A protein has these predicted regions:
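Active-site and adjacent substrate-binding regions of carbohydrate-active enzymes
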Residues: 1-316
Length: 316
């Protein structure tokens, strides 16, 4: 709870104090949320990521997680979108085991997609151990989902590489392997981008992306990873992996013409990962670049619905 001196009242927040929880039991609040969604949908956005969706509703005497009433709200949002904006998408962010996340698809009447969090660290584990078991084991634990729903699979995103869904022993192994520099560790994860995690080893970057693009589900690429962008470990919290996209060698990496001091975060300028060395414009003109390799892999994937939509059989 945090005191608001303007309202002269306390308010509840599950996470940061600048993220107050809304009272979805109040119909006026839900209508205000619908109004905000309509604004962005009318602007042309393709969908919404429902952040930390398991904690939407609060009830006294509970952990306020995965409550039945949360699913009621999601169904209402889905119905409103389907009726007025067909073809738009709801993506659930629920950092839980696959069998628990399954509930957020409903009967094809809640979220269209959901992140598969436990798969992500196990791809890194498989590469480090040169063993397929971490991947095959979690895929065996992944339940069937409605025909028109899909898992969103990923290697990195705007947060830390979360190790919440592994054992303490596995977490220590991954920390020691990928984050020997303790500055890279945050919460229960690692605050590095893909290329630094792979120590700029192009073959390992390609191997991980090949795994991602051939898994059941829809691959979700984090901006900049397609060109091997680095991070800024000296920035606080998770900001090190949220630096401006590096489009060219122009000012601020082509991201903005503004005074660099006015940017929310500074562009990367070091010799290895800075925008003078790593950018879209340069790689677009190089047929052997990571960007063009990624484009070719995506083209191959799109040629067959077996990738992502096909069935998967484990070979012993």
């Amino acid at each position: 709870w945090t005191w608001d001196p303007v309202a002269k009242a306390w308010y509840w927040h599950r996470f940061f104090s600048h993220q107050p929880d809304l009272n979805y039991d109040n119909p006026a609040v839900l209508e205000a949320v619908f109004k905000t969604m309509r604004f962005w949908l009318d602007m042309g956005v393709d969908g919404f990521r429902l952040d930390a969706i398991p904690y939407l509703i609060e009830r006294d005497g509970t952990s306020n997680e995965n409550l039945r009433e949360t699913h009621t709200v999601i169904k209402a949002i889905r119905a409103r979108i389907e009726a007025n904006y067909p073809g738009r998408l709801l993506l659930a962010e629920a950092n839980m085991w696959p069998e628990d996340v399954r509930e957020y698809f409903g009967d094809d009447d809640e979220c269209h997609m959901a992140y598969h969090f436990p798969l992500m660290p196990r791809m890194y584990m498989a590469i480090a151990q040169e063993d397929r078991f971490p991947i095959t084991d979690i895929l065996r634990q992944t339940p069937e989902i409605p025909a028109h729903c899909q898992w969103a699979i990923f290697l990195r995103n705007h947060d830390e590489l979360t190790l919440e869904m592994v054992t303490d022993r596995e977490r220590d192994y991954l920390w020691n392997y990928y984050a020997a520099d303790r500055r890279a560790r945050i919460n229960l994860g690692i605050r590095r981008r893909l290329a630094p995690l792979m120590e700029r080893d192009r073959r390992r970057v390609e191997l991980l992306n090949s795994l991602l693009l051939s898994m059941p589900g829809t691959p979700t690429l984090y901006y900049g990873d397609e060109i091997g962008m680095g991070d800024n470990i000296y920035l606080g919290d998770r900001d090190g992996v949220r630096t401006p996209m590096q489009w060219s060698i122009d000012r601020n990496g082509g991201f903005s013409r503004a005074d660099p001091a006015s940017l929310v975060l500074p562009p990367i300028m070091d010799p290895l990962y800075g925008y003078l060395s790593v950018n879209v414009e340069t790689q677009a003109g190089d047929p052997h670049s990571l960007l063009n390799w990624t484009r070719r892999m995506l083209a191959v994937r799109k040629q067959s619905q077996a990738f992502g939509r096909g069935t998967l059989k484990m070979l012993s």
